[in-house]
Each structure stands twice: as C-alpha cells, then as structure tokens.
C-alpha cells in the first residue's frame, strides 16, 4: 500500500491502475440511486479534492460511508482510474474506506459545506484553513516564502536571524510592545517615582522588535549581502485592512549599495516571487481569479512583464498637483503620500510599478542618508498598481556625524544606539536596504482585501485569540 498526496493523483504522477491510499478530510459526499457514493477528499496538498467512487458492496458502506459528512477524516484505499466525469482527469475506485475521525454533530459543525463570510471565519480561525479560501491563501503564502528564500540564496545572500526582543526603536515612532516580567500590581519605583526597569528581567526597558533592520545592518557590514525574514510587532491602534500588530517582514541589507542598487533588487525580487506563484500555484490562483479578484492572475502577469518607472518625490508631488484630480488628502511638498496618491501615480499616471525616491527628511526615519540638498533623504517607496506602497527602503546614513545630527534632531539618545554608531566608527561603508511586508505582499498576490485573512492567527487591537 502506497500513501500518496492528492496532488500526485490529480496531476498524473501516479500510474493508472496503481493501488494507493489517500488520507484527508471529506469535503462533500453525494449518493446515487445506483448504490454508489462519490466522496470528495482533500488533504491540503492542492486546491482540488480527489473524487473517490465507493460502491455499496463495501462491508462498511451502510454503517460508515453513508454517515460521512463534511469534515470527517478518512483513509481511502483504491485504484487510480481515468475519470469519465468533468472536473478531474483521475479518480479513485475505492476498495476500502476507513473512517479515522467523525464530526461530532454535523448540524453544528462550524465549517459545514456552505459559503461563510470572511468575518465569521476570523471567529473560527482554528478551523478556517479547511475552507477553500484560507487553504489557498496558506499554500500561496508558503510558495511566496520559499521563493523569497530561494531568490536570496541564488543571489548570494545570507539569511540572518535577528532578535525579537530589543531595546532599540528602529523607526523612532514609539509604538512598541513592552516586554517585562515585573509584577504589574507591585511595580518597583525609583526615587523620582518612575518604574525602576533596572529590576526587570533584562535590567532595562525591553520591547518586541518593530524591525530587524538595525541588527541586519551589523551583519551586512561583515557578510556583505544579508536578509532577515521574521515576525515584527507594532503597537499601533489601527483597525484597518492594512494593519496588523504582528506581521512578517523581509528586510535585505546590502553592503556598498546605493539607493538605485536596492531599487533594482526590489524589482528583481518581486518579479521572481510573482513568477514563482504563477508557475507553482496555478490552481489556487485560478480560484482567486474566479472568486476573489478577477484581476489576480493578469495583475501578476502584467507586473512581471512591466519595467518599473522611477520618479523623485518632488516631481511626484508636481504630478499630483497638476493632474486635475480631487484627492481626499491634500497634496503639498512635505506631505507623506497617502494610499490614494500612491495608487494614482501607479495606476493612472505611470500605469506601471513605480519607485518614488528622495523624500523629505522630516517624514522619514533617522537612519536614512541625508542628500546634499539638506532637505531630503535617500529613501524610496515601491508603489504597485492595485495597492500602493509595497516596499519601503533607503540608503543608510554611513557618516557618523550626520547620523548623530539626525538622532539629536529627532530627540533620540545616541547612547541608546552606541552599537549602531560603532558601525560608522570602524570601517564604515555605504549600504542600503528595504523592508517588504509579507502579509501585504500576500494580499496583493491573492486579491484578498484584508491582511487579517492572509496570516494564520491575526493579532489586532483587542484581539489575541487562539
């Protein structure tokens, strides 16, 4: 007996007339008047289920087969045969059906065979991967993650595991989750009445990381080309379709690289991973195009074949001011472009992905390299048609005096960044990098509108279930 995944049978990788066993869950069961049952079995290896044809001459047909309902787990042995019906090329002529697990009460089973609202599925996040939608999202998420690692490996990058607990605020925004073992009901105090964090586990204030970038830079200054890929955390009280409190980030850091170098890297990365999804997840993408977003496949195909446009922030503002379109958010030099501005540039003006460069220093982080004009920094955003910003990056400030000036300007204590400043004291180099939010990437690929539905267990304000 050979146990095989459903995908191998459906894709013809198992010889016709072979006896195999598949293990999975019942999606549907229908019975014919001729005493034959058709069981759709899925195991998550691909989008489509495998049809098992079960005759009533099986010894447990009456007691087990006719009691099967959506969600029951089964182990079915049979012969692979060409399917005479539409919808699949192969099916399984069952010779044995073993019920591994029953659904206690089919009438109250939360994942009964019907369409559920996306809001309802969030309430049963432990069961929602059994649905077509979330199962497809999970496979695409996996394929994207594998493609990202593959891209960087093939291009000579080293993956660096950066810490989740940190004492540094990379973005300087202060929206961080505190990590503490202090007794909240009996906090130690200093003579000034403040919380005495010297008594805490780490002997100082500690937080969940908002970015692996600063730590990644230390390894780029030794290994040249590195990237991080891991969870990050923002205590931002935002209840929007684009925000999560816990999400994953991809952050390459490249030694001796300019802003233009990492803009090219961003373009190559996105095109590589999008092509991987088109090649490897055709069945799931066909589902997204049919049920979620009819442009899901064509959007990726067009993206892969498009040349990225490039524009300076100052010129982008001029384009927006002179386009004749009314925006909800005002446009002026110095404003942080909103999603509607970004989408106009990518969808209406350039009609292609676009890299906006050289932003005003006042709306960007302390570590971004100051340009010669003293007003802008070497920062970039990659804007994609259909979503807006998908990547944010910059050339990092490698000059110690300029970095110290920015820290002071932004009210940050340079002593807190002593180790980061050391990189500028000992063999400093120009270097650049960017951040790519993984969940926003998945949402863009699948057409799923809310990032809460592209991560297994979303963490949002007032929600940390499961």
Curated annotation (Swiss-Prot):
- UniProt cross-references to InterPro entries, sorted A to Z: Aa-tRNA-synt_II, aa-tRNA-synth_II, aa-tRNA-synth_II/BPL/LPL, Asn-tRNA-ligase, Asp/Asn-tRNA-synth_IIb, NA-bd_OB-fold, NA-bd_OB_tRNA
Gene3D superfamilies tied to this protein: Bira Bifunctional Protein, Domain 2, Nucleic acid-binding proteins
Q: Which UniProt keywords apply?
A: Aminoacyl-tRNA synthetase, ATP-binding, Cytoplasm, Ligase, Nucleotide-binding, Protein biosynthesis
Q: Does the keyword Kinase apply?
A: no
Establish whether keyword Cytoplasm is in the entry: yes
Q: Name one GO biological process term.
A: asparaginyl-tRNA aminoacylation
Quickly give the catalysed reaction: tRNA(Asn) + L-asparagine + ATP = L-asparaginyl-tRNA(Asn) + AMP + diphosphate + H(+)
Q: Which residues form the signal peptide?
A: none
Recorded GO cellular component terms are:
cytoplasm
**Domain of life the protein comes from:** Bacteria
Q: Name one GO molecular function term.
A: ATP binding
Main localization of the protein?
cytoplasm
Q: What EC number(s) does this enzyme carry?
A: 6.1.1.22
Q: Output the PROSITE patterns linked to this UniProt entry.
A: AA_TRNA_LIGASE_II (PS50862)
Kindly list the places in or outside the cell where this protein is found, as annotated in its UniProt entry: Cytoplasm
Subunit structure, as described in the record? Homodimer.
Q: Which family does it belong to?
A: Belongs to the class-II aminoacyl-tRNA synthetase family.
- UniProt-listed HAMAP family: Asn_tRNA_synth
Q: What is this protein called?
A: Asparagine--tRNA ligase
Its source organism is: Pectobacterium atrosepticum (strain SCRI 1043 / ATCC BAA-672) (Erwinia carotovora subsp. atroseptica)
